[in-house]
């Protein structure tokens, strides 16, 4: 199914001992942390970011065995944007790591 999926990620309750698993900076606080967009291909997206000299601020990371990976970037106003897509081939995603928010 094609379309747009927008996720507004809010850290409203401190369930992770102050660790916000969805931000690319160490300081954690309640509130809106970032917006997330679903993409078709994490590999193609990473290639496009590189081609356009857009720095990945965190990632690629996977949060579990759901078959998806995320990269985080910053817009010109320094807002965090998550780009999340399926893992087509783990071996073709350089630097893919499992992100443990409690580590």
Language model features with spans:
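Conserved SAM-binding loop
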Residues: 83
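Vicinal oxygen chelate
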Residues: 1-36, 46-74, 87-103
């Amino acid at each position: 199914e094609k379309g747009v999926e927008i996720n507004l990620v809010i850290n409203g309750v401190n369930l992770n001992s102050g660790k916000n698993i969805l931000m690319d900076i160490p300081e954690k606080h309640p509130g809106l942390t970032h917006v997330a967009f679903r993409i078709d291909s994490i590999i193609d997206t990473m290639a496009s970011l590189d081609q356009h000299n857009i720095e990945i601020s965190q990632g690629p990371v996977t949060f579990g065995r759901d078959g998806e990976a995320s990269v985080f970037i910053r817009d010109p106003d320094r807002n965090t944007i998550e780009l999340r897509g399926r893992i087509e081939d783990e071996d073709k995603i350089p630097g893919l790591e499992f992100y443990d928010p409690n580590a």
